[in-house]
Amino acid sequence: MSGCPFLGGTLQLLSSNPRQAEEEDGSQGGVNKAAKGGIIYGDYLQLDKVLNAQVLQSEQKGNKIHDEHLFIVTHQAYELWFKQILWELDSVRDLFIKKHVRDERNMLKVVSRIHRITMIFKLLVDQFAVLETMTALDFFDFREYLSPASGFQSLQFRLLEQKIGVADHLRVPYNRRHYRDNFHGEESETLLSSEQEPTLLQLVEQWLERTPGLEKDGFNFWGKLQANIEEGLKREKHQVEKMEDTEVKQELLEDLNKQMETFTALFDSKRHEHLLSKGERRLSYKALQGALMINFYREEPRFQVPFQLLTALMEIDTLMTKWRYNHVCMVHRMIGSKAGTGGSSGYHYLRSTVSDRYKVFVDLFNLATFLVPRSWVPKLNPNIHKFPYTAECYDSSYNSCSSEDSD
């Protein structure tokens, strides 16, 4: 018999007794609580405001352009996600500022919130693909209605850069002016106020400086590492010098000399200060030591969560660079080499911001330069081997073993 294959016993809901069939259907066993009053979905999310915030300038001017709606919604979505990133970032900074990270059990909270920021940034990087469904000609149709509005005027993105720790003196000037000059009134005051607060970079730096095991009168990681590396390089050079004179021997000696120069510079505090003044390093000398120690001992229980944090911070830098790059590519595709709607050089200005000048945790990336064979890494003493909340008691950089209340 031909007909619908679903007209079998499973459709007994359409039987002569619909009430009985409904009672037997488990999917209908809930209760409609909305009928009893209280806040409902649209009110909770204030959708009347959100969904009515798309005002097309082309329509206001009597020439409604379809793709302007996509342009507005996409940028509003960016701003909402920026707001969430700032929410997470401020909470992490607060945990550091109030010294809750001295109780290392709170570090998992820090890592998970930083990880959430990276997940949001991944979404923001991918979101450009939606905007790129619009062609350059589609954008041209309504671009004239945008001026002098510009993405550079995004207060939240400037706050995000500032709070993470983008160095003010390394920023590329915007039309030969300080970036803050593009903001006025309350927005300018908000930026000024934010600049007085410690950045995530500064807070992480202070935390790294307290890494257990850096104390010269304790484990003295740095001193032991320097001695081990110098001895290791000396042994390697001795082995190479015993080889027959060949091109391979010469190459190995040149490589060893470069390594020696690299590590001589690493253990030279004055050299580090010089690189700091040039903006080539961002962390203090002691903080760099802490970061390298965490990398070497990342498999130890004490250092596993700190290593996850350093990895997540590098991921933020990576994703922000990808975001800038995708933005540059999109702008180049949409307007070519034209000036931006806000008056900047457009593509050329944006391209100049895709560099290490805007990387906050560049020192963490450069740690790979200083990796050595595991046999050269100093062996940990039993105290540092202990789990986080017990090891804190043996760490002279902490004043006590008491935990503090956390948010």
UniProtKB/Swiss-Prot annotation:
Keywords: Dioxygenase, Heme, Iron, Metal-binding, Oxidoreductase, Tryptophan catabolism. InterPro entries: Trp/Indoleamine_2_3_dOase-like, Trp_2_3_dOase. Signal peptide: none annotated. Its cofactor is heme. The keyword Metal-binding applies. Coiled coil: none annotated. One of its GO terms (molecular function) is heme binding. Pathway: Amino-acid degradation; L-tryptophan degradation via kynurenine pathway; L-kynurenine from L-tryptophan: step 1/2. Its EC number is 1.13.11.11. Heme binds at residue 327. One of its GO terms (biological process) is L-tryptophan catabolic process to kynurenine. It catalyses: L-tryptophan + O2 = N-formyl-L-kynurenine. The keyword Iron applies. Substrate binds at residues 71-75, 143, 341. Binds 1 heme group per subunit. Belongs to the tryptophan 2,3-dioxygenase family. Homotetramer. Dimer of dimers. Heme-dependent dioxygenase that catalyzes the oxidative cleavage of the L-tryptophan (L-Trp) pyrrole ring and converts L-tryptophan to N-formyl-L-kynurenine. Catalyzes the oxidative cleavage of the indole moiety. This is Tryptophan 2,3-dioxygenase B. The gene is tdo2b.
